[in-house]
Design a protein with these regions (language model features):
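Terminal domain-initiation and capping elements
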Residues: 1-191
Length: 191
């Protein structure tokens, strides 16, 4: 089976990329092999949490064009026992004997505001999951143990400029509807 490499990198601020830069400089991380970067920022985790986009912009400055096909998923809010960090995922060309961690990723087309939280989103996510499973060279969906989704939500601007009615005019409620549609898409994609 294909193999993967994961690094957990503590950060001191949404734009702190020193740990990521060190891994690259010391040749312990190859940006060309990145599949995804997940992160936790100090933000509030709500619709207006700017720290997610701030962190993504900082990652893009460090990695440049290498982020073009990399899923960048930031989650705001580090209350309680959580601390800010990045988790990098690389797909390696190596194979191992027996089971190992394999990764695949797909980035869907941008959904229109009127598609967020609808069956169109469910179908789009389902196809993306199937594509990611194929790219990970996994032949049996029973071997899939985790699917990470970055799902869109409605903002006031997206609602106001939508060419068609949206499922809700409540930006906070759109988070739940989008997550629900994405979750159903994962289930449909895995059978």
């Amino acid at each position: 089976m294909p193999r993967a490499r994961v690094h957990v990198i503590p950060t001191s601020a949404p734009d702190d990329m020193s740990g990521l830069q060190t891994l690259i400089e010391e040749k312990n991380l190859d940006p060309a092999r990145l599949v995804a970067i997940l992160g936790k920022t100090e933000g509030n985790g709500c619709v207006n949490d700017f720290t997610r986009a701030f962190s993504v912009a900082a990652i893009q400055r460090v990695l440049g064009n290498a982020t073009e096909n990399v899923a960048l998923v930031m989650s705001g809010g580090t209350e309680g026992g959580l601390s800010p960090h990045l988790v990098t995922f690389e797909a390696l060309d190596e194979t191992g004997n027996g089971p190992s961690m394999a990764m695949g990723a797909t980035i869907t087309r941008d959904l229109s505001p009127s598609e967020i939280g609808t069956f169109t989103q469910v179908e789009c996510v389902a196809e993306a999951v199937r594509s990611a499973v194929r790219s990970a060279l996994i032949s049996d969906s029973d071997d899939v143990h985790f699917v990470q989704i970055k799902c869109p939500l409605l903002t006031s601007d997206r609602i106001a400029t939508s060419d068609a009615p949206t499922v809700t005019n409540d930006t906070l409620k759109s988070m739940g509807l989008s997550r629900g549609a994405s979750s159903l898409g994962v289930a449909l994609g895995l059978g």
